[in-house]
Amino acid sequence: MQLREDLTPKQIVEELDKYIVGQKEAKKAVAIALRNRWRRHKLPEDLRDEVIPKNILMIGPTGVGKTEIARRLASLVGAPFIKVEATKFTEVGYVGRDVESIIRELAEASFKMVKAEKMEKVREKAKEIAEEKILDYLVPMRVKRYGTLETFEEETSPAREKFRQMLRNGELDERTVEIDVEEKGVSVVGGVIAPGLEDIENQLKDLFSSLAPTKRKRRKMTVREAMRVLEQQEAEKLIDMDEVASEAVYRAENFGIVFIDEIDKVAGKSTGSSPDVSREGVQRDLLPIVEGTTVSTKYGPVKTDHILFIAAGAFHLSKPSDLIPELQGRFPIRVELQPLTKDDFVKILTQPKNALIKQYKALMATEGVDIEFTDDAIEAIAEIAEQVNEKTENIGARRLHTILERIMEDYSFEAPDLKGQHIIIDEKVIRSKLGDIIQSEDLTRYIL
């Protein structure tokens, strides 16, 4: 995916509207933050370094679209993106993940993205080389009496071309061939590191794998699989990994987006007592990363000055002012996301590109079953979702997944026997499947 930094704020919001219902304020904030990056790149170099991104703090209950907005935003512009949970990190000196691993993960995501792009560019060339190698296995070159190679073009060319055509038509896909596959040395580190020290384990694995020589192993596989393996091998040979690493670091530094979820869980609760030392320690460790520092990664040092950080939390038991003042100041843009209503649920079920109703219809269509939800059924599902969220924990749009799974359970199980049928799901069906559960609060808690 190529970087698309030239999108206007309106275009960004329009794209986000295709997947996320409501939350206009949050969409507007991230759209402006993204456009400001494009504006920064248009500035003279001496001024460019002075402009830092305005990090965003999203406040709102679970299931209202906080994570989805950040993920879709990154996907939209082709930027390196990672989501981390603040609760997974501990203060330096305690067992747990080190906050610098956030940037290492971002660099890794950036590297994979750039590598995939570069490999796509050389895909055709790699395919040609892989094809020739497969043909070498299928139509081997003749050997002279004294052991030297000779191609005998006038004899082998017609046969080779015939096999080439058959290969391209897929006629040889199931034939078995033996090919030489490159294999890295087996890691000797796995499973010996204590929990919480995964970063050290990964670094040791990388070190040992780089020291281990590349082995060639002869493997038997189908022509289809051999083409895929050889194409991958050849594509990796055609790209310059140093160039990929350099580009990955540049993108992580200038276009990276880090989404820190559950930031409220490391905020000191307003109990009047002193804040939890470990929680405050995580905040203090996060501070230099968000402020701007340099983190060593296996692809090179990554400066965090221009990475966009989006933090999110429900803040049920704490409030943003419970965060340490220094960290509060690093998230100048505050956006409150609204709880979802019945009308929002109706839209979520039908309007987005990836709407749940569309997903279930497509899944059942693979079995030859045509499912249709009536308007009153959709209204009933939305109403039930709102009721259950009010009665129990409010988990937002995620409640729809639970309810729909319950409704579709029998149809999904019997789908192979329902082939060719047109099934209409109306309000009566919804009420009959969920009525008893909704009336009993105990059942609601456990089943929906």
UniProtKB/Swiss-Prot annotation:
It comes from Persephonella marina (strain DSM 14350 / EX-H1). Keywords: ATP-binding, Chaperone, Cytoplasm, Nucleotide-binding. PANTHER family: ATP-DEPENDENT CLP PROTEASE ATP-BINDING SUBUNIT CLPX-LIKE, MITOCHONDRIAL-RELATED, ATP-DEPENDENT PROTEASE ATPASE SUBUNIT HSLU. Belongs to the ClpX chaperone family. HslU subfamily. Disulfide bonds: none annotated. Pfam families: AAA, AAA_2, ClpB_D2-small. One of its GO terms (biological process) is protein unfolding. ATPase subunit of a proteasome-like degradation complex; this subunit has chaperone activity. The binding of ATP and its subsequent hydrolysis by HslU are essential for unfolding of protein substrates subsequently hydrolyzed by HslV. HslU recognizes the N-terminal part of its protein substrates and unfolds these before they are guided to HslV for hydrolysis. It is found in: Cytoplasm. A double ring-shaped homohexamer of HslV is capped on each side by a ring-shaped HslU homohexamer. The assembly of the HslU/HslV complex is dependent on binding of ATP. ATP binds at residues 21, 63-68, 261, 326, 398. GO terms for cellular component: HslUV protease complex. This is ATP-dependent protease ATPase subunit HslU. GO terms for molecular function: ATP binding; ATP hydrolysis activity; peptidase activity; proteasome-activating activity.
